[in-house]
Amino acid sequence: MPILATTPQAQVRSAVEPLVRSGESPAPVGVIDLDAFDYNAVQMPTRSGGLPIRVASKSIRSVAALRRALEHEGYRGILAYSVPEALHLVGEGFRDIVVAYPSVNRKALRELAADDTARESITVMVDSVELLSLLEGSVRVAIDIDCTLHLPGAVIGPRRSPVRTPEQVSALAREVVRRGHRLVGLMAYEGQVASVADGLPGPVGAVKRWLRSKSMADLAPRRRACVAAAREVADIEFVNGGGTGSLQESAAEGTLTELAAGSGFYTPAIFDDFTGINHKAAAFFVCQVSRVPAPGWATVNSGGWIASGPPAKDRVPVPVWPAGLSYSSTEGAGEVQTPLRGADLEVEDLVWFRHAKAGEMTENVDRLLAVGHDGVDVWDTYRGQGWTLR
């Protein structure tokens, strides 16, 4: 089932417009539709096969949004980006945090080692002996397992870990234990499934669907063997995998004890071509018209918040309200201004965009206007708290 709603609801627009026009919340500003956010939060566990979902904080980047996500049934713990982020979240009262990526931040690792609460709350990720050598004291450790699909002449998927075989898992697991750390988990993320749309038409869509299917078939026995190898060495608390775009496929394999998802709460534009995601767009950013350079054109300040990944059309923000807007073919979405064509707009009018990805939108705003039935709440982003992912 495709995305159910891609434009802001009328009540959301009417709540935000006076705040922007009055200057109380100057544009550009981020907006969260709480009805859609909560709807999406309810939908994801219906695809998780009964497995708990760890909330991927990098896709949310707001403490208030994280709290709301974790209030919903079916969610447990946080999947953080970095040790500094995890330490910050512990300071905010969160516990059960797995850091999804290895850290070489010696200062943060020293802070982790010196803080009893942090050591019990945070699990760090490793994929090599070199990373183990950076750890001090005794900390909770998880091993990252490579889940890429290897085809003749090509590797499909995110290049993450060098640990690919059960033998490699066993060797690194034994080294974790030998050095006095606690091996508590495994991560095995199949990014080439979770982030590859399966609903595109034509030959491109057919190839992507085949890659998703082939990836899961290739990964299942290898991931199962890697998990068994780790369990021979230590009492593993969790095996994490999956993402918003692969919850049902990842859960069905039977190897994982938990899933991860974060983007699904906001449901950015990059998920519009996934057939199994029946969500509603919950996150928008709003820019304001600052000039009308010619009939049929309107230019907004800012707008060019391009998403990470291979440069392509699907990394560009989508103007979704008013309907029918399009970019200039010679300018596109700009850093300081964005010309748009296709609507009868005037100076000070609002234009609503969807970012291509989820958490990256928040790097551009200090706060989010969270619009619900009871009015508008203001949620600080990480940036609004004075820090960013690092």
Where do the protein language model's features map onto the residues?
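A charged N-terminal "starter" segment
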Residues: M1-A114, Q385-R390
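Glycine-rich tight-turn/loop motif centered on a GG-T
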Residues: S22-D33, D96-V99, T117-I122, V155-V163, ...
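Active-site-proximal beta-alpha core segment in soluble small-molecule metabolic enzymes
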Residues: A56-S195
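Active-site loop/helix belt of alpha/beta enzymes
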Residues: C147-T267
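Active-site loop ensemble at the mouth of alpha/beta enzyme cores that anchors a bound cofactor
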Residues: P201-A206, W210-K214, G245-A323
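C-terminal accessory subdomain/extension
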Residues: V292-R390
